[in-house]
A protein has these predicted regions:
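Extracellular beta-strand ligand-recognition surfaces/modules
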Residues: 18-21, 68-108
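Secretory/extracellular carbohydrate-interaction modules
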Residues: 1-43
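Extracellular beta-strand elements of beta-rich domains used
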Residues: 97, 115-119
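Residue-level signal for short segments within beta-strands and strand-turn junctions
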Residues: 23-27, 101, 121
C-alpha cells in the first residue's frame, strides 16, 4: 500500500488520492455527472469536504488517523451524504461506481486494494450492532 506523497485533495493542482470510491448519482443542468468521491487522503483530515463543482470530495480516512497495511471498513449512507453535499435528494439511484487510486499530478505512487463493496437500499445496520444484550 502506498499514498502519493505531496498529494492534497484540497489543492486542485495536487488532488491525487491514496484510494477512492466514486459514486455518480445525478447530472447537473449541463449534463455533467454529480459524484461523491469517498477518499483515503494523504493530507486532509477525516470529515474534510472539497467542492469541485459537480464533484464533491469527502475524506473518510486519512494518513494522519490510520496507518497503511490495515483493512479499513467504512459504512456510508450515500443518500444522506448527497443531501449534505448537494443540498437535496438525488433524483435517481447511483448510475456508476468507480474504485480509484491516482498519483499523476504529484508524480508519485498510489497503491490501493478494495474488497467486499456492498450497496444496500433502505435503512440498514451493521450486523454487529443489531443484537440487544438479551439476544447474545
Amino acid at each position: 500500500e502506498a499514498l502519493p506523497e505531496g498529494a492534497n485533495e484540497q489543492d486542485e493542482d495536487r488532488n491525487d488520492t491514496g484510494g477512492a470510491v466514486y459514486v455518480t448519482v445525478d447530472t447537473d443542468w449541463l449534463g455533467r455527472p454529480k459524484s461523491i468521491k469517498y477518499t483515503y487522503s494523504s493530507a486532509a483530515p477525516v470529515g474534510t469536504t472539497v467542492d469541485y463543482g459537480p464533484l464533491k470530495v469527502l475524506v473518510v480516512a486519512s494518513k494522519a488517523e490510520q496507518g497503511l497495511g490495515t483493512w479499513i471498513t467504512h459504512e456510508r449512507n450515500v443518500v444522506e451524504d448527497y443531501k449534505q453535499l448537494f443540498g437535496g435528494s438525488p433524483d435517481t439511484t447511483p448510475a456508476a461506481v468507480m474504485m480509484w487510486g491516482d498519483s499523476n499530478t504529484v508524480n508519485g505512487v498510489s497503491t490501493v486494494d478494495f474488497d467486499d463493496i456492498l450497496f444496500l437500499s433502505g435503512p440498514t445496520s451493521h450486523p454487529s450492532t443489531t443484537a440487544s444484550s438479551d439476544e447474545r
